[in-house]
Amino acid sequence: MTKRSRRIPAASLFLIGLRAAAGPQTEDEMAIAEVIEDDGEREPLPIRVRLASLRDYEEMCALFDDLDEIHRQARPDMFQPFPPPARTREQIAHWLAQPDSTVLVAQSEEGVVGLAVLMTRQPSGFAGAVPRKVVEVDNLVVRADQRGRRVGRRLLAAAVEWSRQRRATHVEVAVHDFNRDARRFYESFGFAASVDRLILAA
């Protein structure tokens, strides 16, 4: 009698196309995200979206802990606890130092309440692929007590702006099947499903 393989929920890849940007902007101009509106359920939180620095390290680790725990609870088959820190100082320093990656943080009066990690993906080596420059939103998380206050939307707007500054053609994000709220969030911003990645336990 053969063992029946169990279907595991999929992850979806979402993308949004970008128009070319008109030249680089300064860190202060990243605060453009402050004026972006969205459909948050609570009163918007006054924030400034800026480039992260290592001075934000402890607050960023707390946010990564929150994000990791969400995934551990929903997908224990894929994510497991590991010794702290949530991300090493060296790893974050590398993201900040490279021209093709960065971390954006949402700063409020009480500190850092959200972050987004952005990575530029190398073009495909496949001759049949249309040349694209893609920025991936590798992580985006808002502190639990500040969700629904338009922080995530303003972070995402700043992420798209950062991508435009670097002449990206698309911004992409992978969303696990369990995270329906995240899927609705990205779709409301204009992202559209591109690839459904299906997996099967062997």
Model-inferred region functions:
Residues 164-174:
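Conserved GNAT acetyl-CoA-binding A-motif
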Residues 148-161, 188:
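Conserved acetyl-CoA-binding loop-helix of GNAT-fold acetyltransferases
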Residues 69-91:
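Conserved GNAT-fold acetyl-CoA-binding loop/helix
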Residues 153, 165, 177-195:
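Conserved active-site alpha-helix within GNAT-family acetyltransferase domains
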Residues 90-104, 136:
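A short helix-loop-beta-strand connector motif used in the catalytic cores of GNAT acetyltransferases and
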Residues 105, 111-120, 136, 141:
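Conserved beta-strand in the GNAT
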Residues 14-18, 22, 27-58:
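Conserved N-terminal entry element of GNAT/NAT acetyltransferase domains
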Residues 122-137, 147, 194:
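A conserved beta-turn-beta hairpin within the catalytic core of GNAT-like acetyltransferases
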